[in-house]
């Protein structure tokens, strides 16, 4: 995290990826930009006008020639004076230019993400927009890129700002009621407070669901394959991975440990996890594998519950294995996979029973695997035609979850006790957690972690 002294420094870094290329860009930000331009270029270019110029070192030796651009603050990316030198992309040339700039007093190399950090500190970006820059650079799918662009445009920030405004207005109303104790109960019981609070909770819930999808697009969905031994879990892992990742035999209990495969479906990242078959076992090693299987199941974003279609015709989970589903976390999404349809002669397909997706397939022959792939894409939030939702991170989900807890506690106090002061405090804490998302209220340590993960030059 920057200190006040650091913030006064002028910083320099290569803005293009390291290595050889047709063009290499050196970016400078800070009050010494004009001095850099005068010493390396002979004069400072006109604002926002590209000039083709020779680049010199401080001994007036020619280093390169290329395009120079000057953006005076505050009308620049960082909000400070910014100078960009676009020369040839050889690493030696770029290094010579940067070394020449660093000879000027008051200039130092930029830390990772420091240009974006200065943009945030100068109110050119909020925190979600700054994070979207890093996400856009790191993205590996068109859908994720669209989502990152939506965040960069301020889509996520706008939703949070609207929610914060609603919390502030309700908080003002509640605190006004507290200031008039003789009428406080009338204020709190007139239906406006409870109605507005319920609307805010509903709004937060929808944002939270959208943020979860944005997180899955960024980080990838954790898919855990679970079921009884010999249901075909390892065969399904191999079919999705497109290779023989897991050993497959007719012997029940072959898989005793957790197996992981990182795959992409139309560039959407998925983490597929194969687990030991779930059963009572006297074998100590197999017991450990089963315990690990349950650990993975509890951390999953979605569970694929494998069923041997030869053994049961049941469709509903409670009819297949009620004890297993009783142990699943209450909000855990899952899909029932009826495997081995090549042997049971069930038709391949996908349907729903009581809002539970059921896929009929054969992991061994591959029939129905494409249906499963499409289903998983849908679960992640993939759409070939949409402009994408916004991108989100785990810290955003944590902040939203904390905000939701305080809202629900406030509602409980309102309904049970008409406790205006407690409700006002819960609304204050809600506002604080929401502001952490956009950076209105954020600790220096968190900012250091966020911007430290950026690449240098951004």
Swiss-Prot record:
Family: Belongs to the TRAFAC class TrmE-Era-EngA-EngB-Septin-like GTPase superfamily. TrmE GTPase family.
EC number(s) recorded for this UniProt protein: 3.6.-.-
Encoding gene per record: mnmE
Binding site for Mg(2+): 234, 255
Tree of life domain: Bacteria
PANTHER family, per the entry: TRNA MODIFICATION GTPASE GTPBP3, TRNA MODIFICATION GTPASE GTPBP3, MITOCHONDRIAL
Subcellular location: Cytoplasm
Protein name per the record: tRNA modification GTPase MnmE
Keyword hit for Cell membrane: no
Function recorded in the entry: Exhibits a very high intrinsic GTPase hydrolysis rate. Involved in the addition of a carboxymethylaminomethyl (cmnm) group at the wobble position (U34) of certain tRNAs, forming tRNA-cmnm(5)s(2)U34.
First-level EC class: hydrolase
SUPFAM superfamilies, per database record: P-loop containing nucleoside triphosphate hydrolases, TrmE connector domain
GO cellular component: cytosol
Residues holding GTP: 230-235, 249-255, 274-277
Organism from which the protein derives: Idiomarina loihiensis (strain ATCC BAA-735 / DSM 15497 / L2-TR)
Co-factor remark: Binds 1 potassium ion per subunit.
UniProt GO molecular function: GTP binding; GTPase activity; metal ion binding
Cofactor(s) needed by this chain: K(+)
TrmE-type G domain: residues covered: 220-381
InterPro entries reported in the protein's UniProt record: G_TrmE, GTP-bd, GTP-bd_TrmE_N, GTPase_MnmE, MnmE_dom2, MnmE_helical, P-loop_NTPase, Small_GTP-bd
